[in-house]
Amino acid sequence: MEKTIAAISTAPAPGGIGIVRISGGEAFAVAEKVFRGVSGKKLSQMKGYTAQRGGAYTPAGEKLDDVVALVYRGPKSYTGEDVVELSCHGGLYMTKRLLQLVLDAGAAPAGPGEFTRRAFLNGKMDLAQAEAVMGLISASGEQARKAALAGSTGVLSRKIESIKQGLLEQAAHLAAWADFPEEDVPQVEEAALLEGIRQGEKALEELLQGFDRGRMYREGLVTVIAGRPNAGKSTLMNLLSGCQRSIVTQYAGTTRDVVEETVMVAGVPLRLADTAGIRDTDDPVESIGVQAARQRLETAQLVLAVFDSSQALEKEDWELMDALEKVPAIAIVNKSDLPTRMDVEAIQKRFEKTVSLSAATGEGLAALEQALSEILDTKDFHPQEGVLFTQRQRMDAQTALDSLREGEQALVLGLTLDAVTVCVEDALHALAALTGEQVSEEIVDRVFEEFCVGK
């Protein structure tokens, strides 16, 4: 029998309540050593999905706190085991004391993600669903939440299962033909086999194409705000972040360090970096900031290139445009509240999207959000349809796709059907690894060590 485990499942911060979760064959026995209900009914006598008010007591009979106990009976629980959740007042000290009482009563400390790991091992979810649970916990926006929720309810798993079923039909026919050549087994129709393989390829290609976009919503985009000094970069940073994150003055060269903030724009988390104004300078401190700005441009996933429309284009503006030729970027013609002296058409010719904006007043912010939505192609992302969440899933899907492409090539070149069979079976193994049907304990350990304790 697995040991009974316990952990604090609420955040390590003061709050309205704190929850200690207990799971395992001895969950009721352990909890009953700590909890006394006002009704006098023991937890082991309660039905699943019921609650009782009471208190938590030390072995000496001293009351620690008022507590509500929630009972879940296996297998109809999150972990598939008997589960008790004890809710107390949410002070850090109080919750830790309650956990210690539970551990002293016989429970073992839970490791990272151990509750969800048990749910996986007990067949309550597959590995892809478990990783989606982690996605729900870490979701920083609406699209990421929707994708994670869909994954946790099995949408991705059902997609993978559909691909597998199509390939299993092909593999079964190939195996029957190879194993019983003298029996009355229909000949393999190579045209139908080729079509089945290509259908699997298409489905996997669609999943892989959605991975980068899904990651964009989960992890955000490294976004650099760049431009020459006093173009309004820091004012834009403050506008987007909703507070004064960067110092703004009338003097050029005020920003010297890289100032960072994550903001939500057009539904996408932008990991903003406000950099020093790019120019030649004799100031040794400012030159370090300028060098850091140039380095950030090389690794940026998106650049907001800010130009001061109240001034004519200068050498630094042209150099910035040259540096961004191969980088996804939006030109922001700033200071639209002032008379325009800049050749805006010259900028428009160099960028896919150009937005006129006043970072000082906020006018044009909606246009910037629209431009971001278009350049990032957010309208065609449908998170409820199921997306790949992790690099592990992406690698397994890519392995399956590569195997199918090899099988298609073998078929087209006229190689033996045995060679095609090996490729189809390799694809099936990769898909089984993706959902956790065939996966090593090392991989399982690696997945769940990313979780927090208590989940």
Residue ranges of each PLM-predicted region?
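A glycine-rich (often HGG/GG-containing) alpha/beta subdomain
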Residues: 1-146, 150, 154, 330
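Short glycine-/polar-rich loops that comprise or flank the Walker A/P-loop
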Residues: 15-17, 49-52, 299-303, 326-329, ...
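Switch I (G2) and immediately adjacent beta-strands of P-loop GTPase domains
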Residues: 52-65, 69-73, 253-281, 299-302, ...
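Glycine-rich, N-terminal phosphate-binding loop of Rossmann-like dinucleotide-binding domains
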Residues: 88-90, 240, 275, 307-310
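Inter-motif core of Ras-like GTPase G domains
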Residues: 286-310
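Conserved beta-strand segments of alpha/beta enzyme cores
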Residues: 108, 269-271, 353
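C-terminal-of-GTPase-core extension/linker across diverse P-loop GTPases
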Residues: 2-8, 12, 142-264, 281-283, ...
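Short, acidic/hydrophobic/Gly-rich beta-strand patch recurrent on exposed beta strands
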Residues: 21, 237, 274
